[in-house]
């Protein structure tokens, strides 16, 4: 198994695993290597084996994705289309904070400090095994308090007025419950298509925020 992974980064002979024509992705291969390396290191420490065969394995290089952002001249149309869909508050907050999608959708009304114009980020939502699961962010540094503009506070207050009995800042117009991250991503893609903008990932809105903040001298921290 490990020799196959080491030589080509692919496991084609395991036919019960459904793989694409090109085999496993670079990230998956590197993840498998990390897991095996840690296990084998422990085996060496416990004197179960003499050496770690994972040492010196040549891993496939991570491909650098070209960073894309939403062009400035598309931000207005983007937000206008979001407003038409009843989702201006969510997308406005995203473009003014650069939150991760899971962080954005896990926000509670109690996370908003209207008086001090801040929002507390302490959790994220992901779909795991078909269920929406709320958990802590990736790292301790991801737990933070962010300053937000007055307009964002106003929009969030209006948003809360639409569903005052829900603890969440943003709820799905279809279900009235927590917004599904995948559904939210699809909405982002529909907005891009509607305004004739080049496709960018939802994650690229974080890059958009960071790029524009640096351009206009805003502290992204």
Model-derived segments and spans:
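Basic/aromatic-enriched alpha-helical hairpins
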Residues: 1-22, 39-42, 196
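Generic beta-structure capping elements
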Residues: 3, 59-62, 122-124, 151, ...
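Alpha-helical scaffold segments in carbohydrate-active enzymes
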Residues: 4, 28-31, 35-45, 216
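Basic, Lys/Arg- and aromatic-enriched nucleic-acid-binding interface segment
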Residues: 12-14, 21-26, 30-32, 45, ...
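Short, basic (Lys/Arg/His-rich) helix/loop patches that form interaction surfaces
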Residues: 13-14, 22, 77-87, 97, ...
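Hydrophobic residues embedded in beta-strands of well-ordered beta-sheets
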Residues: 117-119
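Short, flexible, glycine-rich and Lys/Arg-enriched loop motifs at helix boundaries
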Residues: 123-141
